């Protein structure tokens, strides 16, 4: 059912545009009529039944007026809290510079925006509304490229926003879409608009995958929010991304916040920043995902050229055997598992519990600049120096041990609390095992 001229009786606001309602959305239908007060001079002409009915209607009207007054007081308190929350958000996003384009009509900028999106290889997407799923309602769709941000007003434009071009972008397999938790958006697009999202990079999935890499195959007890991912993977300060937590509060407390028109500029900037940060987050995750692969290739490259001619074998004879340089990945994973079991608690489902303290941003030395560090000097802390000395002593033993023996030997290694598994220390260990050469080390 499509209805026009919709008014929210709780807030008194007029909701713009045509509203689509499904059968399960309609709980009750009632005709509204005013209760007219009967003049006192006519009361003597009424029967007892009429008097009782009139009295009942009058009491009902008084109760309605009292309820209305209480509702207005509650609304005023809610508006005050909402205003204060918006001020906090404004303070947190004021320092950030981001430009955005609002698309709330089909002419003249809708067409150029669609063409720009179609020419991209990677875009990031966000969405807000009420209960984003097949039973919910979309209000805004956010799209970001490396140079532009578009905010599509789905509430005003309606389903035509998809038919006129966005559906082609969302279903295009040649365009990678970066989304944080794509489940809800995929559900509402599929069931309400018949759109199937294709070629998605989900940063929430990426975070779980990287945690599994860092812990040697373990899984975390839960997923991270976008705010937590930005802090952990991009080392962003919590104050820089606090607006994302306030966004969740607004959405939870004020279900209609994203249906206000015109939209508060602070909220528009919030939506723009949220989708803008997804692009660098994906890049950081990809670098971390390929770190093990990069280390293996580097060790492979140096396997023969740094050794003597005596170790060279016939290529035909060695093809079927797994080289020792690749077998070191198993050792590295075993070490990570041992380290993870000492750093994390394991719940009754066998999942590792990530603690709240993990939200603190990591230092640059713990892996955020690992690409440059792999090429330059490996710097070790005092705690890592002890670990380095242990590995220097035991590295020759690891090469010829079985998996069980390697695991037992790994238990002897001291745990380094601040050693980030994706950083330069993994690189040092791998280089130590994969060759007889000791890399240049600057111990600080």
UniProtKB/Swiss-Prot annotation:
Location(s) in or outside the cell:
Cytoplasm
User: What cellular-component terms does GO give this entry?
Assistant: P granule; PET complex
Q: Which GO terms describe its biological process?
A: meiotic cell cycle; piRNA processing; regulatory ncRNA-mediated gene silencing
Q: Which GO terms describe its molecular function?
A: protein homodimerization activity; RNA binding
Q: What is its main location?
A: cytoplasm
Question: Where are the stretches annotated Disordered?
Answer: 49-76
Q: Which CDD domains match?
A: Egl_like_exo
Matching entries from InterPro entries are given as: 3'-5'_exonuclease_dom (IPR002562), piRNA_biogenesis_EXD1 (IPR052144), RNaseH-like_sf (IPR012337), RNaseH_sf (IPR036397)
Q: Which UniProt keywords apply?
A: Cytoplasm, Meiosis, RNA-binding, RNA-mediated gene silencing
Ranges for domain 3'-5' exonuclease come to 142-205
Of which family is this protein a member? Belongs to the EXD1 family.
Q: What is known of its domains?
A: The 3'-5' exonuclease domain lacks the conserved Asp-Glu-Asp-Asp (DEDD) residues that coordinates divalent ions essential for exonuclease activity.
Protein purpose: RNA-binding component of the PET complex, a multiprotein complex required for the processing of piRNAs during spermatogenesis. The piRNA metabolic process mediates the repression of transposable elements during meiosis by forming complexes composed of piRNAs and Piwi proteins and governs the methylation and subsequent repression of transposable elements, preventing their mobilization, which is essential for the germline integrity. The PET complex is required during the secondary piRNAs metabolic process for the piwil2 slicing-triggered loading of piwil4 piRNAs.
State the oligomer form and interacting partners: Homodimer. Component of the PET complex.
This one is known as: piRNA biogenesis protein EXD1
Q: Which organism is it from?
A: Xenopus laevis (African clawed frog)
Primary gene name: exd1
């Amino acid at each position: 059912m499509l209805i026009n001229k919709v008014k929210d009786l709780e807030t008194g606001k007029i909701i713009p545009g045509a509203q689509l309602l499904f059968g399960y959305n309609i709980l009750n239908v009632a005709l509204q009529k005013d209760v007219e007060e009967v003049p006192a001079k006519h009361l003597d002409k009424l029967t007892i039944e009429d008097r009782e009915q009139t009295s009942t209607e009058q009491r009902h009207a008084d109760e309605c007026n009292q309820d209305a007054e209480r509702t207005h007081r509650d609304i005023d308190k809610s508006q005050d809290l909402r205003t204060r929350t918006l001020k906090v958000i404004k303070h947190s996003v004021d320092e950030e510079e981001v430009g955005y384009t609002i698309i709330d009509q089909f002419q003249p900028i809708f067409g150029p925006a669609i063409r720009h999106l179609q020419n991209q290889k990677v875009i990031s997407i966000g969405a807000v509304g009420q209960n984003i799923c097949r039973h919910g309602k979309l209000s805004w769709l956010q799209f970001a490229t490396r140079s532009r941000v578009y905010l599509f007003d789905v509430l005003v434009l309606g389903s035509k926003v998809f038919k006129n071009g966005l559906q082609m972008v969302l279903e295009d397999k040649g365009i990678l879409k970066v989304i944080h938790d794509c489940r809800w958006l995929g559900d509402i697009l599929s069931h309400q608009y018949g759109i199937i999202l294709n070629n998605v990079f989900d940063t929430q999935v990426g975070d779980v995958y990287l945690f599994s890499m860092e812990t040697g195959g373990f899984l975390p007890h839960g997923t991270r929010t976008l705010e937590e991912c930005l802090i952990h993977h991009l080392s962003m300060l919590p104050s820089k991304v606090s607006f994302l937590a306030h966004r969740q509060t607004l959405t939870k407390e004020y279900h209609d916040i994203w249906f206000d028109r015109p939209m508060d500029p602070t909220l528009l900037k919030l939506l723009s920043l949220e989708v803008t940060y997804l692009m660098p987050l994906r890049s950081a995750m990809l670098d971390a995902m390929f770190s093990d692969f990069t280390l293996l290739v580097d060790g492979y490259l140096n396997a023969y050229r740094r050794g003597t001619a005596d170790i060279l074998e016939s290529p035909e004879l060695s093809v079927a055997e797994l080289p020792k340089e690749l077998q070191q990945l198993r050792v590295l994973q075993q070490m990570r598992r041992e380290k993870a079991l000492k750093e994390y608690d394991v719940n009754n489902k066998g999942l590792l519990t990530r603690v709240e303290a993990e939200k603190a941003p990591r230092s640059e030395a713990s892996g955020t600049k690992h690409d440059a560090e792999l090429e330059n000097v490996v710097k070790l802390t005092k705690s890592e120096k002890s670990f380095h000395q242990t590995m220097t002593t035991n590295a020759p033993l690891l090469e010829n041990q079985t998996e069980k023996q390697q695991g037992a030997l790994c238990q002897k290694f001291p745990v380094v609390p601040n050693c980030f598994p994706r950083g330069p220390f993994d690189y040092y260990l791998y280089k130590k095992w994969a060759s007889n050469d000791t890399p240049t080390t600057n111990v600080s």
